[in-house]
Design a protein with these regions (language model features):
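Conserved donor-binding/catalytic core segment of Leloir-type glycosyltransferases
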Residues: 171-198
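Nucleotide-activated donor-binding/catalytic signature segment of Leloir-type glycosyltransferases, i.e.
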Residues: 223-241
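Short alpha-helical donor nucleotide-sugar binding micro-motif in glycosyltransferases
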Residues: 240-241, 248-253
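Conserved acidic donor-binding segment of nucleotide-sugar-dependent glycosyltransferases
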Residues: 293, 298-305, 314-320
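A short, well-ordered alpha-helix in the C-terminal region of glycosyltransferases
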Residues: 314, 321-335, 345
Length: 356
C-alpha cells in the first residue's frame, strides 16, 4: 500500500531486537512496551487489554498527522482500535484471522476462550467493515458474529514469493524422501496426523523421514505420541527453525505437508509452493480453497492419516506429479496472492468503510 503512495503507520508492541520508531519499506512502525508485563501468562485477556493502553498512547507520537481509516488485526488490538476510532471520529476496519469458536470445533469453552470470543464479537460489531482471509472465514465470521453479509469482505493473505524462491530451478532431481511441516505446534494444526502417516509409510517407503519445525503448547503431547508409536527414528521435532534454514530445508524436501484440522487460511501452503516444494494440504477451511481445482497441490481429508500417507507416497514416488504441481503452483501464486493485488482489494474495503 505504501508503494502505491499511501501513508501507512503501524502500531505494535516492542521487541528487544528492533527500534520503537522506524521506517520499514515505506511504512512507519511505532512500538510500545507492554503496560503490565508482570501479569501471569494465563491472564491473557487482561494482559492484552493492558498492552492496549500503551498502544493507544502511541497516537501522541503522531503529532498533527491523522489517518483516514483505522485497521485492527484480530481481537488483540480491539481496545486501542475502538478508542482511537472514537477519539478521531474515523471508520474502523477489522481483520479476523481466526476465531476462538473455530479453534475449538464450533464450541466456545468457558474461561479465556469465552472472554476472547466476546472481544471478537465486540470488535466486529464496532467495525464499519470486516475482512476475512477466505470464503470459509467469511462464512464463519458472518454466521458466528451474526453480521450483515455486506459488511464482511474477502481479502486473501499473501506472501513475498521472492523470499522463498530457490536459487536454482526446482525439480524432483536430487530431492530426498523427506517430508517437511512447520507452524505453531497446536492440536488443531494436525501434526499428530502427519506423524501417524509417516509411521504408516515405514515399510512402503523405508527411507522416508519427516521434520516438523515450530513451537507450541502441544509439543510435549506430540513428542509423547511419537515415542508411543515408535516413530522417533523417522520424525524429528526441530523446534524453532530460522527462515534461512527453513528455506534450505525446503530445497531438499520431497514434499511439504499442512495437515491442519482447522485452518482459516494457511499461509504455510503459499510459502511451500513459493519455495518450489510439492505441497499436500488437508481439505479444510482456507487450505482447501487455495488448492481445490488448481492442480497446485494434493488434498486429503483432515484427520485421515491413511489418505495423507497415500498422497505423500504419490508425490515422492512420481516425479512427474511433483513437477506438475510446482508449475501449477507458480502460476497460482503469480496470479492471486501478490501484495499489490491484495493492497488494491484492501483499499477498496477502506473506501467502503469511509462511505459508511
Amino acid at each position: 500500500m505504501a508503494r502505491a503512495g499511501h501513508d501507512v503507520v503501524v502500531f505494535s508492541l516492542n521487541h528487544p531486537k528492533v527500534g520503537d520508531d522506524e521506517m520499514m519499506e515505506g511504512v512507519r512502525v511505532l512500538r510500545a512496551n507492554a503496560d503490565m508485563p508482570w501479569l501471569p501468562d494465563d491472564y491473557l485477556v487482561s494482559k492484552m487489554a493492558s498492552a492496549n493502553h500503551q498502544l493507544t498512547q502511541l497516537a501522541a507520537r503522531l503529532g498533527t498527522w491523522r489517518p483516514q481509516v483505522i485497521h485492527a488485526h484480530d481481537w488483540l488490538v480491539a481496545w486501542s482500535a475502538d478508542t482511537l476510532k472514537a477519539l478521531w471520529g474515523l471508520p474502523l476496519v477489522a481483520t479476523i484471522h481466526g476465531t476462538e469458536r473455530g479453534r475449538h470445533g464450533g464450541y466456545v469453552p468457558q474461561g479465556t476462550p469465552a472472554a476472547i470470543n466476546a472481544v471478537e464479537w465486540w470488535l466486529t460489531f464496532q467495525a464499519q467493515q470486516v475482512i476475512a482471509c477466505s470464503k470459509f472465514m467469511v462464512r464463519e465470521v458472518t454466521d458466528g458474529f451474526e453480521l450483515d453479509s455486506q459488511k464482511v469482505n474477502l481479502v486473501p493473505n499473501g506472501i513475498d514469493t521472492g523470499q522463498w524462491h530457490s536459487p536454482t530451478p526446482p525439480s524432483s532431481n536430487g530431492r530426498e524422501p523427506l517430508v517437511v511441516a512447520w507452524g505453531r505446534i497446536q492440536y488443531e494444526k494436525g501434526f499428530q496426523v502427519l506423524t501417524r502417516a509417516i509411521g504408516h509409510l515405514r515399510h512402503r517407503l523405508p527411507e522416508i523421514r519427516c521434520v516438523i519445525a515450530g513451537r507450541g503448547t502441544y509439543l510435549a503431547e506430540l513428542q509423547t505420541q511419537i515415542d508411543m508409536e515408535g516413530v522417533g527414528d523417522l520424525v524429528q521435532l526441530a523446534g524453532f527453525v530460522p527462515d534461512d534454514e527453513l528455506r534450505q530445508l525446503l530445497q531438499r524436501t520431497g514434499c511439504v505437508v499442512i495437515p491442519s484440522l482447522y485452518e482459516p487460511f494457511g499461509i504455510v501452503a503459499l510459502e511451500g509452493m513459493a519455495a518450489g516444494a510439492p505441497t499436500i494440504v488437508a481439505r479444510t477451511g482456507g487450505l482447501a480453497e487455495i488448492v481445490e481445482g488448481t492442480g497446485a497441490g494434493e488434498l486429503f481429508e483432515p484427520g485421515n492419516h491413511v489418505a495423507l500417507a497415500n498422497c505423500i507416497a504419490d508425490v515422492l514416488t512420481h516425479p512427474e506429479v511433483a513437477d506438475r504441481m510446482r508449475t501449477k503452483a507458480a502460476s497460482l501464486l503469480a496470479g492471486r496472492y501478490t501484495w499489490d493485488a491484495i493492497a488494491a482489494t484492501t483499499l477498496g474495503v477502506y473506501n467502503k468503510a469511509k462511505r459508511g
